[in-house]
Amino acid sequence: MNEKITTLDEFIFKRQNDFEYAAGELTALLRDIGVAAKIINREVNRAGLVNILGVQGDTNFTGDTVQKLDIYANDKIIECLKNSGMCCGVASEENDDYIPFPALFSKFGNYVVLMDPLDGSSNIDVNVSVGTIFAIYRRTSPSEGPATLEDFLQKGIKQVAAGYVLYGTSTILVYTTGKGVNGFTLDPSIGEFCLSHRDIMIPARGNYYSVNQGYYLKFDLEMRRYIDYCSDENLGLRYIGSMVADVHRIMFQGGIFLYPSTRRHPQGKLRLLYECNPMSFIVEQAGGKAISCDMNRIMEIEATALHQKSSIAIGSPDMVDEMQAFIQKYSAQRG
């Protein structure tokens, strides 16, 4: 007998009491993000048929070329969050500053959302997987006023929920509220995300490492030695160029994802608030680890700016520990 299908909405509602503030607001907010993901998925699937491929012609705050689909995804998520009334503001990789919502749209707005609306969007023109990453925090500012910058600059350990959506051969939404990690696959026949991966746990080790080896000569000597070690140990190199896709594979098959600092980007290149924190929360909840390449736990890093960057090593716990020990050993030898 087939097991009853559990939709994302049903699952979120059943788990509502897991939330510290079980008033239904976070439940509604997560549902609205699911709605936005369906809308984006539709456009991703039609991207080659409509005028939405290619670059917009602009660069965002951190210098990345903006794709047309970046703008579409960004606008749709903001629209869904604004209409929900459960969110007092949003910060996005695609916007220079955070966007506070007027009181009219945030009557119950006790949360803020930070997001990368379309991670890996440069891949869309060649039909390679892209994704959405989001983090949700409870606001720290008074509820009767507008959102403030401090609401968004909270440490990753303060996240109340985080998730990602991978738009690939099938579309899957993975999220956590600090009570484990679950995945939901979009069933196009009914237009619903359905529970497909319950209580995801990352393997302690894996046979893969993921890094942009084109930057090899720009990495610190210790990191180059570690990458050489991975190759010598016959680990397979897998790198897609979309953090969501690369980390999603590691979630199920094990391994380690690396985005080290370089001479050009001494603090790293990925955004702490939009990419590193939410993905770290998810991976840690699945039993993995996430640290910066200077050996600090990602979710403990103090944010001082919306678009702050960080290096990251994330994935199977034994492999992250091994990398940390390896780097520290060779750093000590260099004095």
Regions inferred by a protein language model and the residue ranges of each:
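Alpha-helical scaffold segments that form or flank carboxylate-/histidine-based iron centers
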Residues: 64-67
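IMPase-like, lithium-sensitive Mg2+-dependent phosphomonoesterase catalytic core
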Residues: 1-51, 58-59, 71-335
